[in-house]
């Protein structure tokens, strides 16, 4: 086991603070509308230019082991904020630094670290309650666009495109971000349920100009097995021929005689029909067939629940307004299922998402939920160069997370104003002693740090801006974008409540623990030159006889 170096007391705290400051100072230059970018060197590819706090934090590793420990703990704050709310990583880092700096000063002055931490925790609990009281619901499209714009570094085009996407696919809908091919951002919306299975035979195509199958007001037959015998399908096909409506068959597979007969009937115009494979595999396929059944108001014909295909009637079939099938995808638009059953299915899947531990399973469940709830939107980010593309894509993803957080828990005035207002209301938190009281003061002072940093990054005097905002009331704050004061909500400067709450809670949690540090242990770095002993010289060979 390698030898360890142990440092105690003030020496430990000073070195830890140095690491905190290096990381936080690199991250906090990105805060606010006039925040700067940070360039990150990559071992392969071009350097990454970013204004995303957590991306900067993740790149930082320090040589000094003790400084690095401080930096890694603050990195954890940014990562936690990113995981929970998807945004607010820079705010969380600024708050953590402010609490650590003030807290370590108090410890150096002889105050009890544990009481300081308890005071900070009490202040944060009170602050979170006040934040929730200050929060307003974010319901309309305009507010969603404003939140997304602020999070995307005041880029209105990103705000608008996210608001439009949310409007089209609903709050439960899936919105994905991809790299586009054009210079401008584009939005593709797939309404209805789409799954990645195309037609089983090109002879089903009835729209040669687009190479697709389009069925208007079709019946939908869902079968959880392979169909190879046409006799099983005859009762359904005979019933359909009388109605004159088209049929979509979704089965594990349709092959041999059954597929050939369907193709012939379709080409002769006896029955308008198309067949596709069911999406997914195993249990996921069963679940997705059930989703389609609920969406279209049909029943899955499965032998394991005692239903046989030969005995199926038209009442077992689902219906939809329209179905479009291409070589690779099938889209069911406006299924005629009951809304109450669809809503129940969505809430059931939502429950599974919460219980699932696998990221892959969560993603697949959320996709299923979105397809039932409304559709899928794809934002294609446009840019002139690859470097700009990466930076812009990261901003769009941040804005999307912020918007989801805003819809979930509402919004508060942005620009650091919410925390300043909250701090003024919780000054009288109940404490047991003077040290705890000072812990509360540390937390209240730290709550001003984001506003001060936004002002500093905008080239203004932080104390002047902070005092002006503190002397105001309600939503009055500082708009760093155009250097004016006014009502933040009216100016459209909003922060999601969840983002602000998570930033404060995670910053206080980790910074509070750092204040209570009394000793640090790290491996002593070994120099390579010391590890390798020099090889002894070879003695000369004796003369040969």
Swiss-Prot record:
GO annotation (BP), single: protein refolding
Entries under Pfam families matching the protein: Cpn60_TCP1
An annotated Gene Ontology molecular function: ATP binding
Catalytic activity: ATP + H2O + a folded polypeptide = ADP + phosphate + an unfolded polypeptide
Lineage: superkingdom: Bacteria
Keyword Nuclease: no
Matching PROSITE patterns: CHAPERONINS_CPN60
S-S pairs: none
Family, per entry: Belongs to the chaperonin (HSP60) family.
Subunit structure, interactors included: Forms a cylinder of 14 subunits composed of two heptameric rings stacked back-to-back. Interacts with the co-chaperonin GroES.
Function in brief: Together with its co-chaperonin GroES, plays an essential role in assisting protein folding. The GroEL-GroES system forms a nano-cage that allows encapsulation of the non-native substrate proteins and provides a physical environment optimized to promote and accelerate protein folding.
Protein name, entry field: Chaperonin GroEL
